[in-house]
């Protein structure tokens, strides 16, 4: 595993997931530049295990704060000793193959003789598989811990094989669950690097803000003399499917998706809280705000209040500021004025007709019988005025007409007929276009208000409404008993 000559096979598939746990404990000696970097964060030895190197490297990145604040898996080392060591301005802890190569360029295996023999281990192991040599038990054990289709880059040395055989003999009586957990321990160095380095950089930053790092199982300040392998073993035992990720595969496996998802989840949990941009629109208290968005209403349609000079939308009748009624909001009622003008015109026409013709010099002819002519003219004026007054007063009966009837009953009948004629004349004199016709007769206008209680309904003429009252009929609209009928006049 610690062979610096990492030659990739011709088929392109490279993996280290089959390396036993004892290979991870192989002692390595950092080169002077890497050793200087490790000692700057508290390292005191000359030889280290791979896990110790990764731990100190993560401590260095965290101490120098070389990581990106937002994307904490990215490390910037352009102006740092780490950049001189790796020869790159920046890298990501997710680039396992690249980091794996850069680290091992600066490491020297303690036992060079044993590591030099690992270059021919591929052919030797194939011979052992075909010939059935004395190490058949070891091969079977290795076949259980690795995929049959994967190709090896380097094999462990002879001493590591012996240690693996002794470990398998000691653990032969353990349960299958312990054997499965042992296979998790024998995962790739690159996986340990990713978790040791990435979690040192990312997780310990979160430790300063919360105590959520307890669930990760990675110690923040481990005892390097006695507790490195123990803590790393506990961390490997706690992880499950996410440990199956192997960086040496050209094509990512299905397990790698689980690992990447869990890693991204860890990063998201360590970042600051997500901030969402929300736009809040304050609604107005009135309905006039909708006119501003109406494209059919322009500023020319707005009206100006005479009290406070406020510009208001065209539809509301009151000012939005002072609540003053809009000037000329409704047309003036000119019905009365028209009636007065027509009456005055009639009177003038009648007086002009009664006075006769004028001479060109606008003077009347003087006659000897001027008094008699004046009396006759006055009599004519009186008679014509009385006739016009009778027509304007809806043809009221003259007082002299009652003398014609001898009996009192005849007088009552005449008065009843006169009142009916008066009502009919009033109904006929009203303009039909001003009000709707009676619902019952469809001929006369609606001027008979049917009153019941404090309310009334105007839906029939006065004659039809009186007939309903005489026949004790209810109101046709609300079916309430009719109390009275009121004759309604319209201007």
From Swiss-Prot:
Q: Zinc finger, RING-type: residue spans?
A: 438-479
In-chain residues carrying the UniProt-annotated modification Phosphothreonine: 419
Question: Which GO terms of the cellular component aspect does the record hold?
Answer: centriolar satellite; cytoplasm; cytosol; endocytic vesicle membrane; glutamatergic synapse; nucleolus; nucleoplasm; nucleus
Q: Which GO terms describe its molecular function?
A: 5S rRNA binding; disordered domain specific binding; enzyme binding; identical protein binding; ligase activity; NEDD8 ligase activity; p53 binding; peroxisome proliferator activated receptor binding
Per the entry, induction is:
By DNA damage.
Q: Which CDD domains match?
A: MDM2, mRING-HC-C2H2C4_MDM2
Which parts of this chain are annotated as the region Disordered? 141-187, 211-237, 253-274, 371-427
Segments of skewed composition (Basic and acidic residues): 409-425
Q: Locate the motif Nuclear localization signal.
A: 179-185
Biased composition regions of type Polar residues, renumbered to the chain: 149-159
Role of this protein: E3 ubiquitin-protein ligase that mediates ubiquitination of p53/TP53, leading to its degradation by the proteasome. Inhibits p53/TP53- and p73/TP73-mediated cell cycle arrest and apoptosis by binding its transcriptional activation domain. Also acts as a ubiquitin ligase E3 toward itself and ARRB1. Permits the nuclear export of p53/TP53. Promotes proteasome-dependent ubiquitin-independent degradation of retinoblastoma RB1 protein. Inhibits DAXX-mediated apoptosis by inducing its ubiquitination and degradation. Component of the TRIM28/KAP1-MDM2-p53/TP53 complex involved in stabilizing p53/TP53.
Protein's name according to its UniProt entry: E3 ubiquitin-protein ligase Mdm2
């Amino acid at each position: 595993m610690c062979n610096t000559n990492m030659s990739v096979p011709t088929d392109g598939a490279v993996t280290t997931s089959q390396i036993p746990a004892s290979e991870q404990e192989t002692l390595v000696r950092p080169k002077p530049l890497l050793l200087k970097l490790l000692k700057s964060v508290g390292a005191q030895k000359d030889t280290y295990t791979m896990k110790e190197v990764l731990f100190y490297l993560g401590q260095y990145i965290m101490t120098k704060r070389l990581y990106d604040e937002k994307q904490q898996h990215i490390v910037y080392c352009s102006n740092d000793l780490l950049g001189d060591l790796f020869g790159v301005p920046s890298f990501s802890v997710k680039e396992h193959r690249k980091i794996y190569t850069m680290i091992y360029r600066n490491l020297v295996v303690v036992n060079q003789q044993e590591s030099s023999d690992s270059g021919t281990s591929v052919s030797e192991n194939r011979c052992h598989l075909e010939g059935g040599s004395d190490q058949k038990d070891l091969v079977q054990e290795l076949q259980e811990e690795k995929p049959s289709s994967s190709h090896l880059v380097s094999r462990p040395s002879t001493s590591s094989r012996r240690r693996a055989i002794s470990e398998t003999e000691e653990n032969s009586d353990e349960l299958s669950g312990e054997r499965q957990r042992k296979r998790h321990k024998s995962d790739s160095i690159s996986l340990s690097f990713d978790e040791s380095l990435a979690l040192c950089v990312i997780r310990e930053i979160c430790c300063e803000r919360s105590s959520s790092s307890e669930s990760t199982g990675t110690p923040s300040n481990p005892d390097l003399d006695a507790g490195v392998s123990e803590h790393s073993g506990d961390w490997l035992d706690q992880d499950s499917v996410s440990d199956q990720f192997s960086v040496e595969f050209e094509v990512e496996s299905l397990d790698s998706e689980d690992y990447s998802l869990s890693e991204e989840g860890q990063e998201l949990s360590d970042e600051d809280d997500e901030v969402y941009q929300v736009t809040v629109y304050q609604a107005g208290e009135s309905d006039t705000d909708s006119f501003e968005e109406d494209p059919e209403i322009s500023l020319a349609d707005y009206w100006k209040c005479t009290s406070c000079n406020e510009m208001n939308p065209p539809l509301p009748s009151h000012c939005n500021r002072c609540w003053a009624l809009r000037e000329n909001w409704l047309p003036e009622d000119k019905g009365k004025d028209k009636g007065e003008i027509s009456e005055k015109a009639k009177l003038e026409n009648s007086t002009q007709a009664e006075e006769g013709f004028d001479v060109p010099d606008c003077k009347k002819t003087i006659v000897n019988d001027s008094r008699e002519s004046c009396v006759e003219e006055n009599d004519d004026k009186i008679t014509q005025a009385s006739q016009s007054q009778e027509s304007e007063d809806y043809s009221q009966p003259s007082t002299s007409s009652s003398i014609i009837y001898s009996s009192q009953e005849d007088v009552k009948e005449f008065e009843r007929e006169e009142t009916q004629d008066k009502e009919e004349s009033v109904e006929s004199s009203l303009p039909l276009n001003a009000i709707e016709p009676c619902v019952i007769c469809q001929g006369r206008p609606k001027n008979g208000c049917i009153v019941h209680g404090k309310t009334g309904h105007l839906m029939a003429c006065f004659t039809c409404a009186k007939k309903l009252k005489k026949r004790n009929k209810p109101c046709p609209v609300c079916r309430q008993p009719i109390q009275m009928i009121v004759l309604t006049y319209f201007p």
